[in-house]
């Protein structure tokens, strides 16, 4: 399968990319910075999740899209609530729209265990809102999806 991983230069994305590559999938990584861990055979596209043209280039031709691009630091999200909305919600909606346009078979979203708690501040709010959008895209537009709720990931 052809797989695109947004946020693929990060801790989680880079490990998922490597595992998928080992299993024979064609992996395209899309991130705001070039991956330090890019493996042989993986394609790298550098761009911002909010740049629709670059995001579309990353998604076009993919069978599956893993959405790992996020403002994932809880403290940073508290200091930058607008960025948490732009990246975690708007970035996800832009990705969903392009997945529909290019007939992506499955959308996999990295969320957080905080969505059902009172912890996590704006990070929690943005991840919960993104999950709500994903569920509505499934109901209204039929996109197949998986939501993964991770705990804290230490590097």
Can you name each region flagged by the protein language model?
Residues 41-51:
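Rossmann-fold cofactor-recognition segment
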Residues 6, 30, 65-69, 107-113, ...:
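SDR active-site strand-loop-helix element
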Residues 112, 132-155:
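Conserved beta-loop-beta element that borders a ligand/cofactor-binding pocket
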Residues 18, 92-93, 128-135:
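Conserved active-site helix of classical SDR/Rossmann-fold NAD(P)-dependent CH-OH oxidoreductases
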Residues 25-34:
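Conserved glycine-rich Rossmann-like NAD(P)H-binding loop of the short-chain dehydrogenase/reductase
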Residues 49-86, 98, 114-117:
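NAD(P)H-binding glycine-rich loop region in Rossmannoid oxidoreductase-like domains
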Residues 3-23:
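N-terminal Rossmann NAD(P)H-binding glycine-rich loop of SDR-like oxidoreductase domains
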Residues 86, 90-128, 145-146:
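Conserved Rossmann-fold NAD(P)-dependent oxidoreductase catalytic core, especially the SDR/UDP-sugar
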